[in-house]
Amino acid sequence: MNSRSFLIMAGLLLHAAHRADAQQDDGLYNQLHQASVEILVDRRLAGCGCIVDPDGIVLTAAHVIKNANRQIEVMSASLGRLQGSLLAMDAAHDLALLKLPKRKKPHPYLKLVKKPPAAGSTIYLYGSPLFRHDVMVPGLVARKQTTFEYVDGEYIEVVHIAGLVTRGFSGGPWVNREGELVGIQSSAMALGDAHQGLAFSAPLEAARQLLKSREWTKYATLGAGIEEIWEQQPGYLEKLPEDTSGLVIRVVHKGGAIDASGIAAGSIISAMDEQPVERRDELLRLLWRHQPGETVELEVSAADGTQKRTVPVRLGRLGPDPQTPIPRTKVVKKERQ
């Protein structure tokens, strides 16, 4: 084969591969279009979700619903506009389950992937950014392990995804090329109003567990926002003893566990139950071994690193009260069969 023939053959192969990828992406889009929904809360478009069960179970972000005392409707091209009822919530992973009315035939739905995608894998998000409907965007799994982010005054466990994700995508499905669900969009990293190119997704295993139990979860909280020592400004670090390690309490929620224990903002947590902590993830993973209402012992010192002492802290509960009445709303439009 001469060089001219080789180049022609290579070009044809590349063109065929491109067409195959385009067809696969179009099929993926159509699949997401059928199984994804928009969620109206008190008649306003609040976020997105996806059907994950043929009986009409919808998975979305907890912050889209916020609490059960709301009028919830679900809207999609395939279903029309229907009532929805809140089944369960996992505030620690920003997840909520909704239930759609029964219908004669199974609902279109997304299957959960069996194994989380590896770091660097391409995945896709579907939703309604800034009130624009039916948008699919790509992203990359940016971190192998889950981590914790401080969102709306509480820590949630998330997966980091590299991608520009705007408001309105909340609750939307992240899927792989095969259309299998790998996560639910939660929020994103921002400095002020500037997006930093890192999105936060609810972990796959948390979604799987919520679907299995269909019960409100119980996770403990300290009622505080913390920063790692090495995040602090040079002037602050210069005033600390060189051997100081731990986490700086930057925000104390009034009436929360830290506040009730008399620990002030600026204090430094160096251990929980005699186990040293230097990173947020270390502290929060230890914390979540406990149930709300249990007591832990925190080793804390003053803001200057002195006056180290051990303080008992009775843990609070993360998220809304599950005993709040669940609303029953009217069907606005009959579903499409």
Annotate each PLM feature.
Residues 1-7:
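Bacterial N-terminal signal peptides that target proteins for export
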Residues 8-15:
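Bacterial N-terminal signal peptides
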Residues 18-44:
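Protease-domain processing segments flanking chymotrypsin-fold serine proteases, especially trypsin-like
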Residues 23-29, 84, 107, 129, ...:
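C-terminal cap/linker of serine protease catalytic domains
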Residues 36, 42-46, 53-135, 158, ...:
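Conserved active-site neighborhood of the chymotrypsin/trypsin-like protease fold
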Residues 37-39, 49, 56, 60, ...:
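Terminal peptide-recognition signature
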Residues 42-47, 64-72, 106-107, 126-138, ...:
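Active-site loop architecture of trypsin-fold serine endopeptidases
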Residues 164, 215-271, 275-286, 301, ...:
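PDZ/PDZ-like groove recognition
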